[in-house]
Design a protein with these regions (language model features):
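Regulatory N- and C-terminal appendages and interdomain linkers associated
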Residues: 1-43, 47-50, 176, 217, ...
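Conserved ATP-binding subdomain of kinase catalytic cores across diverse folds
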Residues: 42-162, 211, 267
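A residue-level signal for conserved active-site and pocket-lining positions in enzyme catalytic cores
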Residues: 65, 110, 151, 202, ...
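Active-site activation/catalytic loop segments of kinase-like enzymes and analogous catalytic loops
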Residues: 65, 227, 231-249
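Conserved kinase catalytic-core segment
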Residues: 95-112, 161, 166-230
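ATP-dependent phospho-/nucleotidyl transfer catalytic cores
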Residues: 126-127, 131-197, 241-245, 257, ...
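C-terminal regulatory or interaction extensions
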Residues: 145-146, 152, 226-234, 263-265, ...
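Mobile late-domain/C-terminal helix-loop "cap" segments
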Residues: 244-305
Length: 314
């Protein structure tokens, strides 16, 4: 059975890789542009862009793309551009298997819990290999730049210090700089709880940003979500930054204390946990429908059962 690379649902007769409605959501066109590269011939281009790092997201090639409009009768295609591209492509890596499938699935799981994410999908290289693609929210349709600053910048830390700090500190920065601080603080803690539930220990300072799409600074839609516990099972840390002074052996009381300290009341905190509890069945369905290999399906199911029991049933 052929499935849509965007929504994981079965394709209809004559459809290739995407439903038309799904292609429009990510590519703003009913037909997906072609991606005329393979992993082998893109490696040299990737080396020019990727900075050396030992983190999962750091070792992923992040290539800036835009859509080249073909002449009459020719299909649109993606081309690698400079920093001003409207799309970011993450190919497979040699070190960690199935990161594109992992990230796309985890982003869908966030959406199922009511978390707003950047537009994203899987896409194929010319040889059929799957990649992850996302459309940037800090670019206009014409390629112009929308002001955006991550928490490294707002906390005046260097990029290499992105793992230094706490989630409580990010909440304070959101309260200080957001035009809608109460809403954005709730949205922020939703992402932190979701990341813990899905085994994501890589949500560092650069993975949270404020942007200004319409004369107000707001928390951006969520990006860079993936399960590092599935990709790197040897890592025993549960979070990238500290929560209540620690990165592992986290429990519900740690989250509740941090949320209260940032201004959330008990009713809002309770609703947040209830929302995730309701999303668990949909998460299991998405995992089963995803493009991850069957073995990783099983590992993800098992992890969600474990983390949800620890956090949502206490």
């Amino acid at each position: 059975m052929c499935k849509c690379l965007y929504c994981y649902k079965p394709l209809g007769e004559g459809e290739i890789d995407y439903h038309k409605r799904c292609a429009r959501k990510i590519f703003e066109s009913g037909t997906a542009p072609t991606l005329p590269y393979t992993r082998d011939n893109i490696k040299e281009l990737a080396r020019e862009i990727v900075s050396a790092s030992t983190t999962v997201t750091g070792v992923q090639a992040k290539l800036s793309l835009d859509i080249a409009r073909g002449s009459a009768g020719e299909p649109q295609r993606f081309t690698i551009v400079g920093l001003w591209g409207r799309y970011i492509l993450k190919p497979q890596t040699d070190r960690f298997a199935n990161l594109p499938e992992n990230e796309d699935l985890t982003m869908h799981m966030a959406e199922a819990a009511g978390i707003k994410t950047v537009p994203h999908s899987l896409i194929r290289f010319a040889d059929g290999e799957l990649c992850y693609i996302t459309r940037r929210v800090d670019r206009t349709k014409s390629g112009g730049k929308i002001a955006m600053e991550d928490m490294c910048q707002l906390s005046e830390r260097l990029t290499e210090d992105k793992y230094k700090g706490s989630y409580e500190r990010i909440a304070k920065l959101i309260r200080q700089y957001s035009s809608a601080p109460l809403l954005d603080i709730v949205n922020f803690w939703e992402v932190i709880v979701f990341s813990w539930l899905t085994g994501n220990a890589d949500m560092h300072l650069k993975n949270f940003s404020l942007y200004c799409p319409a004369n107000e600074y707001l928390l951006t839609p969520t990006y860079d979500l993936l399960s590092t516990a599935i990709a790197m099972p040897e890592d025993d840390e549960e979070l990238a930054l500290t929560l209540n002074g620690k990165k592992k052996r986290i429990d519900r009381l740690d989250f509740e204390k941090a949320m209260r300290d940032s201004g959330m009341d008990d009713k809002a905190i309770s609703k947040l946990f209830q929302r995730f509890a309701k999303a668990i069945p949909e998460w299991h369905l998405l995992i089963s429908q995803s493009f991850l290999p069957k073995q990783l399906h099983d590992e993800y199911h098992t992890m969600i059962d474990s983390t949800s029991k620890r956090l949502l049933e206490s």
